[in-house]
UniProtKB/Swiss-Prot annotation:
Skewed-composition ranges (Acidic residues): 448-478
HAMAP family cross-referenced by the UniProt entry: Trigger_factor_Tig
Source organism of the structure: Mycobacterium sp. (strain KMS)
Record's protein name: Trigger factor
Predominant place of localization: cytoplasm
Family statement drawn from the similarity comment of this UniProt entry: Belongs to the FKBP-type PPIase family. Tig subfamily.
Domain characteristics, as noted in the entry: Consists of 3 domains; the N-terminus binds the ribosome, the middle domain has PPIase activity, while the C-terminus has intrinsic chaperone activity on its own.
């Protein structure tokens, strides 16, 4: 087999392939043997019919089509392997010569990773915000802790923000009842914004037993995106009384004996979260600088595929109704033109980022170990509330393991970039990046650090209230 590569653009090539007919003869032999097992000819046992009779029955052209159809993908892969081409996406294959007894000739046009001139990584200077902790932030954490230990007491007055109410809901669309939007005895914190838009405004000022109608747009179900008239009835109103922030409360809500010790712990908790946020800012700034300093040719078909995927996801929940989608955008103060422009900008940035990270990974010779993949799998399984083995099966079934591998490699790459850069805060102080981006931990250390801060926060919450549960993200994986 012979193959040559033509460069059509910085991001696209045409691979020309010639396969001698002699290389296809074993494929014809196998095809006829399989056919002989399936076709019964008078006077011959199954699998023993002569090839000429089989050709006469099926037709030589039909067999040629079958053999060529089965041979081309493998020959394309062989041609790619023998070249330095790094394909992106699926090729567009055109068979230019296909005759029995003659060489098979075809071309394959495919997007490829472009050649990228990378910046001097040692000259990269990253500046981020310093870590500053205010009394107000610590007080917010303390207030949240007090709220978890608050008690609810019934009140005889109109509802206001912060109250806990029991409500009945019903809705109609175009005068018809919406069964899935009907519920009774639903508990809701007024002002939380956790249910449908407009509900909190409708509840404020209502007394026990009073009802009110309001108009809103349904976000889910078969009527998603449609305007509905919702009726809310307040069944009961309770207010939350908070415990005093004293030593007794500290002993109740934590492992500490005094309120001062508890505040010190909350201060450190805020600091841990801010360290993670600073690490995320460092990572984002590093990527931003790299994108600014690097010219990356974009393969249009890959960009368009990303755009198509985003559009599909956006309108899938609306049964691909373009008119309803346009109405939804208008309600959000946007338009289809603005949506399309933003989608293209985001797709181009995403593709540019992936190509840049892959080029950097090659230059830095970033290797992904089994431990890196295992750590990412464990981290993701904790995030989605699944067992690691269960998540692994989901990823395998959806052919997502290569994408996870690429994502881990890119994470390790940006960590290596950060570790080699000069990193300061806006006050001019050097920032030690080894906690999240160190050479021994790489990108996984950052991920683990962020997760560790979340875990610490959850542990603190567990000492605050036994009734809290956090499983919202599990549904995303399921």
């Amino acid at each position: 087999m012979k193959s040559t590569v033509e460069k059509l653009s910085p991001t696209r090539v045409r691979i020309n392939v010639e396969v001698p007919f002699t290389e296809l003869e074993p494929d014809f032999d196998r095809a006829f043997k399989e056919l002989a097992k399936q076709v019964r000819l008078p006077g011959f046992r199954p699998g023993k019919a002569p090839r000429k009779l089989l050709e006469a029955r099926v037709g030589r052209e039909a067999m040629l089509d079958q053999v060529v159809g089965e041979a081309v993908p493998g020959r394309y892969t062989e041609a790619v392997t023998s070249s330095d081409v790094q394909p992106l996406g699926q090729p567009e294959i055109e068979i230019t010569k296909k005759e029995y007894g003659e060489d098979l000739v075809f071309t394959a046009e495919v997007d490829v990773r472009p050649e990228i001139t990378l910046p001097d990584l040692s000259a990269l200077e990253i500046t981020v915000d310093p870590i500053e902790i205010t009394d107000e932030e610590v007080d917010t954490e303390l207030q949240s802790l007090r709220a978890r230990f608050g008690t609810l007491t019934g009140v005889d007055r109109p509802a206001k923000d912060g109250d806990f109410v029991s409500i009945d809901l019903s809705a109609t669309v175009d005068g018809k009842d919406v069964p899935e939007a009907t519920t009774e005895g639903l508990s809701h914190e007024v002002g939380s914004g956790q249910l449908i838009e407009g509900l909190d405004d409708a509840i404020v000022g209502l007394s026990e037993g009073e009802s009110k109608e309001f108009t809103t747009t349904l976000a889910a179900g078969e009527h998603a995106g449609k305007e509905a008239i919702v009726t809310v009835t307040v069944k009961s109103i309770k207010e939350r009384e908070l415990p005093e922030p004293d030593d007794e409360f500290a002993q109740l809500a934590s492992e500490f004996d005094t309120i001062d010790e508890l505040k010190e712990s909350l201060t450190e908790q805020v600091r841990r979260v801010k360290r993670v946020q600073q690490a995320e800012q460092i990572r984002d700034k590093a990527l931003e600088l790299l994108l600014e300093q690097t010219e990356v040719p974009l393969p249009e078909k890959i960009v368009q595929a990303q755009i198509d995927d985003t559009v599909h996801n956006a309108i899938h929940g609306l049964d691909h109704d373009e008119d309803r989608f346009a109405e939804q955008l208008a309600e959000q103060g946007s338009s289809r033109e603005e949506f399309d422009a933003n989608t293209r900008t985001e797709a181009e940035k995403a593709v540019k980022t992936q190509l840049l990270m892959d080029a950097l990974a090659d230059q830095l010779e970033v290797q992904v170990g089994q431990g890196d993949l295992t750590e990412r799998l464990v981290l993701m399984s904790r995030q989605y509330g699944l067992e690691p083995q269960q998540l692994l099966q989901i990823l395998q079934q959806n052919n997502q393991l290569p994408a996870m591998f690429a994502d881990v490699r890119r994470g390790l790459t940006i960590a290596a970039v950060v570790h080699g850069a000069t990193v300061k805060d806006t006050d001019g102080n050097d920032i030690d990046t080894t906690e999240f981006f160190g050479p021994s931990g790489g990108a996984q250390a950052e991920a683990e650090g962020a997760d560790e801060a979340d875990a610490d926060s959850d542990a603190d919450s567990d000492t605050e209230a036994d009734s809290d549960t956090e499983a919202d993200e599990a549904d995303e994986a399921k």
